[in-house]
Amino acid sequence: MQKIEFEKSKIFNKPKIQTKRHTEIIESLEKMLEKGVPDLTMSEFASKLKISLRTLYEIAPSKDKLILMTMDNILTKLGKHALDSVSNIESPIRRLEKYLFIVNQAVGPKFDRFMKDIEKINGSKKMADYHENFISTYTEKLLNEAIEKKEIQQINTKVFAVLFSTIGREFLNEKNRKSISTTPDENANSITSIILNGIKLKN
């Protein structure tokens, strides 16, 4: 059986020597950017964070990379939290349902403003794709385990894994957001539950 473990995203080059101070700065950036991406220069970011511009450039070489790296950290923490939260659940299908509900928070109200702003930044799709691919791989693994344990019917697990990993982004689409009153994460969780219940075997 393939073993899948959480690992830090490798799509961004981290500082060669990440000090405790660097970590504190990145955490401050996470809190700042959860409220939306401010229209600031690197110099203004440094001023807001009360650090030198040189220190900020040690963390990221440009504003876009700084923002993307910070969002990558936020999504990475959410992914690790999701994996930790389901680690003691024996049933693969119950583990999957809880895992997907947690990772769907990435399109929820907490990240609402930020996710809309970050779409304009070059490289954001690559970052989102990286995290979606991880979700898809882990989801496929759990679906295969659920079939082996006769919890769900025979399905194309790769197809369903891709579907589950991309539902949230579809509901985050501006056109869909305007036409649907409920939040993207609520919509994603609702569809996820319907699909999972539809493929479960009744014992």
Predicted feature residues:
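Short secondary-structure transition hinges
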Residues: 105-138
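C-terminal peripheral helix-coil segments that are non-catalytic and often amphipathic
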Residues: 1-9, 137-149, 166, 173, ...
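Hydrophobic alpha-helical connector segments
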Residues: 69, 82-109, 160-164
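Secondary-structure edge/capping motif, primarily at the C-terminal ends of alpha-helices
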Residues: 85-86, 111-119, 171-179
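Helix-turn-helix
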Residues: 20, 24, 28, 32-65, ...
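Short, basic, alpha-helical segments at the C-terminal edge of helix-turn-helix-like DNA-binding modules
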Residues: 42, 71-79
